[in-house]
């Protein structure tokens, strides 16, 4: 069935979001059309404000509205550890468990030869730069338990080991192929407590 152009454009916009197919995009579009003008205006304002006001921390790469982010400026955190994650959602997941008190580094992707992603395509050089001051003694690699996550963790280990930095990996309480952002707090807590050296 063909829809009027404004609805078709809205469906197309929603379908560009990850995990949103045409059916869900259509439902969202019709739901949006049914919202009050005030709610639609608030939604649009919030969307534009988030896009305009958020940036990536110049130190760790986390999503923030202040640069550097509140985690990087928190001097009460453990300065000897950096936990490396794939994206900003993983930082939020780790912060929820309130167990890890070190700093973070967000890669914004994983090494994935099948997808044409190499070490230069992720936020890895700035991690190496951060380690040059000698304060960090351990890097915890918390990439997802996928082939790309494993490839990335092994690459990080190979690069950092010669510098004498201990590189550990989250324990395997996480199922292979699972995403950190969807793991429950107990699983993440056990994964940090039982991490293994690479």
UniProtKB/Swiss-Prot annotation:
Keywords: DNA damage, DNA recombination, DNA repair, Metal-binding, Zinc, Zinc-finger. InterPro entries: DNA_Rcmb_RecR, Rcmb_RecR, Rcmb_RecR_Znf, TOPRIM_dom, TOPRIM_RecR. Coiled coil: none annotated. One of its GO terms (molecular function) is DNA binding. Residues 80-175 form the Toprim domain. A zinc finger (C4-type) spans 57-72. One of its GO terms (biological process) is DNA repair. Belongs to the RecR family. May play a role in DNA repair. It seems to be involved in an RecBC-independent recombinational process of DNA repair. It may act with RecF and RecO. This is Recombination protein RecR. The gene is recR.
């Amino acid at each position: 069935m063909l829809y009027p152009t404004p609805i078709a454009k809205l469906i197309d916009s929603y379908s560009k979001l990850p995990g949103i197919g045409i059916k869900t995009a259509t439902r969202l579009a019709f739901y949006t059309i049914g919202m009050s003008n005030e709610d639609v205006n608030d939604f649009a304002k919030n969307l534009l404000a988030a896009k305009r006001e958020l940036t990536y921390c110049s130190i760790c790469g986390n999503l923030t509205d202040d640069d550097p982010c509140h985690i990087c400026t928190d001097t009460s955190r453990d300065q000897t550890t950096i936990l490396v994650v794939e994206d900003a959602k993983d930082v939020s997941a780790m912060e929820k468990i309130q167990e890890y008190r070190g700093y973070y580094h967000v890669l914004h992707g994983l090494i994935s030869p099948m997808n044409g992603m190499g070490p230069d395509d992720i936020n890895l050089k700035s991690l190496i730069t951060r380690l040059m001051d000698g304060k960090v003694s351990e890097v915890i690699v918390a990439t997802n338990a996928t082939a790309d996550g494993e490839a990335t963790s092994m690459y990080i280990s190979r690069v950092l080991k010669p510098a004498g930095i201990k590189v550990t990996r989250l324990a395997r309480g996480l199922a292979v192929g699972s995403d950190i952002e969807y793991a429950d707090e107990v699983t993440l807590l056990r994964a940090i407590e039982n991490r293994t050296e690479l």
